């Protein structure tokens, strides 16, 4: 049983007396605001409040600068006891909201994170606190701001209404500069990514470093170690909640001096960066063509805070081309995962669903809850994420100005299909295969070794930031379409998404690919299944004998291992990253336990059949993969171990 913490007697550290003058100045632009805005007090409460409502500190109007002399706070030391299981996964700590709402649960993790960071990244530092807007986010922002103040942080940057996409947070860490020249040293990102949101659903928190990327294992391991021994945390309990619905800077005074909360527009910084990467004028011409139609589904996640500004206001798309682009705490009751199962409305509109009506648009796309994942669709055509990153890499230099001077290298996660490998070989590019988790790409990017990278789990990105970026991927595809059609916008027929993919297969071959997810299975059963797969690798002749009994026509396994990665930049080693069976014809079976779920275990089976013969690249994926699917299910004994006769999701 997880222990609840008993009330503690706090130790209070009082602020040094400091008299401030009342003053009013002229509002300034977001990047050059004075750090000395002051707020007024009024009473209000968070929509998802779980703690006693406190007076809100706020600027009177957007951009207003008001000085107050009495907004001071003290620091309280709260006794606490550890909670079990606060181990950050590949993308932070994800649990049910009700778990995070337990006394001191969030505070324990936040303090453990502060304690794991170098002192200069906390004391006097600037940090970002925002996320995808899911339920409990607004409360979490206030708690973290109070703890940041108590731990000596100089200022906290918050996206308006607590909304910042994960890629936008990365961009802000890397690009935004305060009036006194300070940059953010890191960020608490409040997201459980593609997991559902709401009072009974998931919440998550992860820390990103000063390069804009997720904390490396050396830091997350230290955070986890701290959570197991924590005895106290610091918090400024008398700091008023800040009204995060209004932009402006609110300042306070504490024992270590001034502390600011800067609430700013969620989209401006990100849009400024993205416009330096893509040729917006060429994309506008494509979207203006009467022969081109477009649809974007935000799945009621944070992408909605960017979609209208980018696709409608900047690029001229019709507002009717946007679906579910109002961010909601519960994602409209849906599952904000951009795949063929959960993005049903978009899938139907694109002519791929059972209830599809009317003529589909030429191009469709979706993003997940925190807008770092993406799905790309053509008219009645699905682009696998593995193909997507390979096609972007193959066309980037010609289509995207940011890459005009060439690619430094490309990388993919191990479970992602080898389509990118073939592109890299043909274009003579550096290529890297890394474990699942975007932080592994970050090291390569920081070392100037990688420009474009991707994951089979609908994550694609580049070295413009240190996170995967759903909207970047959509704009990359629009750029490729714009380039392919630049001399044909007035023609009878545009080059389509399907045309581009078919041309790619004709050049590089096709990697038929699918993923079977078995969610929330018994954790012990999952471990036993994986252990048996490792044990089988000791004798490949026996493995091949078993395979021939299942499917005689399937090629022999020529190599099998448990994937291990040695980082070429820092030499760190990551073990137990998935089980691989590699076949003589370039096909693969991969088995992996996922670290992103909040309950139970998720077994993922990746099935890949490579076809070089261009005359055979047009088969139905299910037909081409059927023999290997049969082998994967029977070789792993998935039903025997889990009791499941079918996967939860097939991608």
Residue positions per predicted region:
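Proline/glycine-rich low-complexity loops and linkers
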Residues: 159-163, 217-267, 378-461
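Gly/Ser/Thr-enriched, mixed-charge loops and adjacent short helices
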Residues: 74-83, 180, 199-358
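Conserved phosphate/anionic-ligand binding catalytic regions in large, soluble enzymes, centered on
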Residues: 83-99, 193-195, 298-302, 306, ...
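An N-terminal, well-structured beta->alpha segment
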Residues: 55-150, 175, 180, 256-294, ...
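N-terminal small/polar loop signature for handling phosphorylated ligands or for N-terminal nucleophile
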Residues: 115, 123-201, 267, 309-376
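N-terminal chloroplast transit peptides
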Residues: 1-48
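Phosphate-binding and adjacent anionic-ligand microenvironments
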Residues: 361-363, 367, 376-379, 399-604, ...
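Buried hydrophobic positions in well-ordered alpha/beta secondary-structure cores of metabolic enzymes
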Residues: 91, 129, 169, 188, ...
């Amino acid at each position: 049983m997880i222990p609840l913490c008993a009330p503690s007697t706090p130790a209070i550290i009082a602020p040094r007396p400091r008299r401030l003058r009342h003053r009013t100045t002229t509002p300034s632009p977001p990047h050059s605001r004075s750090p000395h805005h002051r707020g007024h007090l009024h009473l209000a409460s968070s929509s998802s409040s779980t703690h006693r409502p406190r007076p809100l500190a706020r600027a009177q109007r957007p951009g207003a600068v008001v000085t107050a002399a009495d907004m001071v706070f003290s620091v309280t030391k709260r006794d606490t006891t550890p909670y079990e299981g606060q181990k950050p996964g590949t993308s932070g700590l994800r649990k049910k909201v009700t778990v995070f709402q337990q006394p001191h649960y969030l505070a324990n993790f936040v303090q453990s994170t502060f304690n794991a960071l170098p002192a200069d990244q906390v004391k006097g530092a600037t940090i970002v606190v925002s996320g995808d807007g899911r339920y409990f986010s607004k409360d979490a922002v206030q708690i973290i701001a109070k703890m940041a103040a108590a731990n000596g942080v100089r200022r906290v940057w918050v996206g308006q209404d607590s909304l910042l996409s994960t890629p936008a947070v990365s961009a802000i860490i890397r690009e935004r500069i305060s009036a006194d020249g300070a940059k953010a040293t890191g960020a608490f990102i409040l997201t459980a990514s593609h997991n559902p949101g709401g009072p009974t659903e998931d919440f998550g928190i992860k820390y990103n470093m000063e390069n804009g990327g997720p904390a490396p294992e050396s830091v997350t391991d230290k955070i986890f170690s701290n959570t197991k021994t924590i005895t106290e945390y610091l918090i400024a309990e008398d700091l008023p909640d800040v009204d995060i619905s209004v932009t402006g800077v609110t300042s306070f005074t504490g024992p270590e001096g001034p502390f600011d909360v800067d609430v700013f527009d969620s989209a401006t910084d990100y849009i400024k960066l993205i416009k330096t990467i893509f040729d917006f004028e060429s994309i506008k011409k494509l979207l203006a063509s009467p022969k081109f139609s477009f649809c974007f589904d935000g799945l009621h996640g944070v992408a909605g805070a960017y979609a209208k500004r980018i696709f409608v206001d900047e690029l001229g798309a019709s507002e009717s081309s946007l679906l579910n682009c109002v961010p909601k705490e519960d994602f409209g009751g849906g599952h904000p995962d951009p795949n063929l199962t959960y993005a049903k409305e978009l899938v139907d509109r694109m002519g791929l669903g059972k209830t599809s009506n009317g003529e589909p648009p030429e191009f469709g796309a979706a993003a997940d809850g925190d807008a770092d994942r993406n799905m790309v669709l053509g008219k009645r055509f699905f682009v696998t994420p593995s193909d997507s990153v390979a096609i972007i890499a193959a066309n980037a230099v010609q289509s995207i100005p940011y890459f005009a001077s060439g690619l430094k290298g490309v990388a993919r996660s191990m479970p992602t299909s080898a389509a990118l490998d073939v592109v890299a070989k043909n274009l003579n590019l550096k290529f890297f295969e890394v474990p699942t988790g975007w932080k592994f790409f970050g090291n390569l990017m920081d070392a100037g070794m990688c420009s474009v990278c991707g994951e089979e789990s609908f994550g694609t990105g580049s070295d413009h930031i240190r996170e995967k970026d759903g909207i970047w991927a959509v704009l990359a595809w629009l750029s490729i379409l714009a380039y392919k059609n630049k001399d044909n916008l007035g023609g009878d027929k545009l080059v389509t998404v399907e045309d581009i993919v078919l041309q790619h297969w004709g050049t590089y071959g096709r990697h038929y690919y699918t993923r079977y997810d078995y969610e929330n299975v018994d954790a012990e059963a999952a471990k036993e299944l994986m252990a048996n797969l490792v044990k089988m690798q000791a004798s490949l002749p026996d493995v091949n004998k078993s395979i021939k009994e299942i499917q005689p026509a399937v090629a022999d396994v020529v190599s099998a291992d448990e994937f291990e990665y040695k980082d070429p930049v820092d030499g760190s080693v990551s073990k137990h990253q998935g089980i691989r069976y590699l076949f003589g014809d370039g096909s693969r079976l991969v088995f992996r336990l996922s670290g992103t779920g909040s309950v139970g275990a998720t077994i993922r089976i990746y099935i890949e059949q490579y076809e070089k013969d261009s005359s055979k690249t047009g088969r139905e994926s299910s037909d081409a993969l059927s023999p290997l699917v049969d082998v994967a299910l029977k070789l792993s004994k998935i039903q025997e171990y889990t009791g499941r006769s079918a996967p939860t999701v097939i991608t």
